[in-house]
Amino acid sequence: MMKKPVVIGLAVVVLAAVVAGGYWWYQSRQDNGLTLYGNVDIRTVNLSFRVGGRVESLAVDEGDAIKAGQVLGELDHKPYEIALMQAKAGVSVAQAQYDLMLAGYRDEEIAQAAAAVKQAQAAYDYAQNFYNRQQGLWKSRTISANDLENARSSRDQAQATLKSAQDKLRQYRSGNREQDIAQAKASLEQAQAQLAQAELNLQDSTLVAPSDGTLLTRAVEPGTVLNEGGTVFTVSLTRPVWVRAYVDERNLDQAQPGRKVLLYTDGRPNKPYHGQIGFVSPTAEFTPKTVETPDLRTDLVYRLRIVVTDADDALRQGMPVTVQFGDEAGHE
């Protein structure tokens, strides 16, 4: 009779263990079965010419798929081609001037400068002698004071001409000053920078797709005169595909960067996409109005960016997505 209470007690213990184990299993399944709700991120970019001008041609229309590097449109190139020719000519002139500064003066130029000094010296000697004679005549009252002043003026002018010729000869023999050479070099560098800018402007008069995408809007037509930066196209970027979702603080530890998840859409309830958490916002925010959640209470959440690793054309921007965490998704 004593065995019956013992058996009953053991049964109670076993039952309690089973219940506890079942509860633990259920909780672990709940933790591994976190479900979030989000949307495929809408990623658009406005494309424009960096320079202004008249639109010459547009190669794509709304709805067209575009590829990175594809030519989408062109401005009238003529003004930029002319500017490029002018810039090239400016570089040629500046280069020639700089080369002259480096080379210095030729022997022929030095010889001509020396001859000019001799000629100026002879003119000065004559003017000085004439002035000396005029001084003697003025003292004897043979000439007027005005005649003496004219002789002095001629002597001073000849002296100034001689000094100028001597300075020029000295410069020719010593070569150009370092300051003059540096100035010529700076002028050349400025002309080269203007040439680089002209080349860039001509290049930017052609609009090229920065990445793959789909053309959403075409804002202008050929013949339109645009200011620099005016929007020409709006493009939806197709790669990479991101899903934006939000997780509350209680489940934040499950949503770590690198965690793999499964992504379900209404059109593919039994064939999930695969994704990986690439970014978790460092700051909390109130649940956005666009987020669909099982409970509608206001909560502080953290934004997630999930990179879809096997996206196809069926996964459209803005499409609602169910994000499933679980053992089958796994970790990085």
UniProtKB/Swiss-Prot annotation:
It comes from Escherichia coli O6:H1 (strain CFT073 / ATCC 700928 / UPEC). The lineage of its organism: Bacteria, Pseudomonadati, Pseudomonadota, Gammaproteobacteria, Enterobacterales. Belongs to the UPF0194 family. One of its GO terms (cellular component) is periplasmic space. NCBIfam families: PRK03598.1. InterPro entries: CusB_D23 (IPR032317), UPF0194_membrane_YbhG (IPR022936), UPF0194_transport (IPR050465). Its main location: periplasm. It comes from the Bacteria. This is UPF0194 membrane protein YbhG.
